[in-house]
Amino acid sequence: MIRRQKYGDEIAKAQVLIEALPYIKKFSGKTVVIKYGGSAMLDCNLKRMVMQDIVLMKFVGLNPIVVHGGGPEINKMLERLGIESKFVNGLRVTDEATMEIVEMVLTGRINKEIVSLINELGGQAIGVSGKDGRLLKAEKDTSNGDIGYVGKIVDVNIDVITMMLEKGYIPVIAPTSFGDDGKTYNVNADTAAGKIAEALKAEKLILLTDVEGILSNINDKSSLISRMDLEHAKEFMNSGRINGGMIPKLECCIKAVENGVKRAHIIDGRLTHSLLLEIFTDEGIGTMIGKECFDDDNL
């Protein structure tokens, strides 16, 4: 009894590792696409913890791919330059001046910061944009009217990503994309992550957000829906109970699962080590979406 009390903390840590074991075994060698954004990009401690999670995932045999946004940083830069930020259904209205700022912030600052932090923590990351190696081909998105240089992805060059994964690197992707018209397009990072996950037939697509997940009542944080099948997700999407930035998130999760991704997750990136909690624990922390009902596991 004395020894159990003395080593209580160590035993608890061992139990955590034991709980994670079946998940590590199941997901070894599998690809996980992570959309990194929201408050987890602004808080230095959270930023470091997210990257620690990603490096750990790599070390235990998963193949993480990071697709990042940068909305708050872009907003700050636009405000500094006196340019107003406008959104339609969660998508940024992007004129030529805004597109220049978006590309500068995403590829020139945020992408390199993420790569540097992963490398500092012992991983090996390579940062690219959707324009590099013709990774993400886009065309003008007019589904919400003309909102400028906003693109929808029409092709993903998976050879570029596969090459990095095979060499042991963690790809870090900024979602600025190229068009056959020679123009650069701003693609919503959630949508880009979903398209990349679809193209790779990834095991998981995980979107880090600033909410607990999908709530049945947006005013009640305890109303988290932990699991949804496709039918439920589509019904919820069409119910009008979500708005703003959650629209493209749920939409891309639905499309990803329809097109070969096994599970899509919307989780709270404000929580410490949220990625590890969602992937390697029995309960998970956010909303998981799959093709059919799941009864007894988080796999």
UniProtKB/Swiss-Prot annotation:
CDD domains: AAK_NAGK-C. One of its GO terms (cellular component) is cytoplasm. The record marks 35, 249 as: Transition state stabilizer. It is an enzyme of class 2 (transferase). InterPro entries: AceGlu_kinase-like_sf, AcgluKinase_fam, ArgB, Asp/Glu/Uridylate_kinase, NAGK-C. Substrate binds at residues 70-71, 92, 186. Its EC number is 2.7.2.8. GO terms for biological process: arginine biosynthetic process via ornithine; L-arginine biosynthetic process. Pathway: Amino-acid biosynthesis; L-arginine biosynthesis; N(2)-acetyl-L-ornithine from L-glutamate: step 2/4. Its main location: cytoplasm. PANTHER family: N-ACETYLGLUTAMATE SYNTHASE, N-ACETYLGLUTAMATE SYNTHASE, MITOCHONDRIAL. This is Acetylglutamate kinase. The gene is argB.
